[in-house]
């Protein structure tokens, strides 16, 4: 991706974050939407917007199916968002927006949770071993 497309993608990412937060008032959009990245096609026809959605009532961050409703809302609002985006972009055409669930970020969060659990378990095991060693030294 050349530098111009990268800059345009970054600008779209910033603008969309504000637009989604302030102007999309659909009650079906229950989670906190974060835009991970935007990839603009070389002909400026499309912009693939990768999002993660943190649902407050869901514990499973890896559940892609739980976010399908929010993605439907975003894809339905894509025309409105494109129109609003056209007011701030300095391009002749505004790319069509396609929203996708960013599985890379979700998988990374899931892996961090697993690592944190393993570290906590290791620390507990180490503390238990130290307590057992001190207890056996006291008996001697």
Curated annotation (Swiss-Prot):
Region annotation (Disordered) ranges: 121-140
Principal location: cytoplasm
Annotated Gene Ontology cellular component terms: cytosol
Keyword Magnesium set for record: no
InterPro entries in the record: KH_dom-like_a/b, RbfA, RbfA_dom_sf
Disulfide bonds: none
Localization, UniProt: Cytoplasm
An example molecular function term from Gene Ontology annotations: ribosomal small subunit binding
Entry similarity comment: Belongs to the RbfA family.
Its biological purpose: One of several proteins that assist in the late maturation steps of the functional core of the 30S ribosomal subunit. Associates with free 30S ribosomal subunits (but not with 30S subunits that are part of 70S ribosomes or polysomes). Required for efficient processing of 16S rRNA. May interact with the 5'-terminal helix region of 16S rRNA.
Quaternary state and interactors: Monomer. Binds 30S ribosomal subunits, but not 50S ribosomal subunits or 70S ribosomes.
Identification of the protein by name: Ribosome-binding factor A
Organism: Psychrobacter sp. (strain PRwf-1)
Gene that encodes it: rbfA
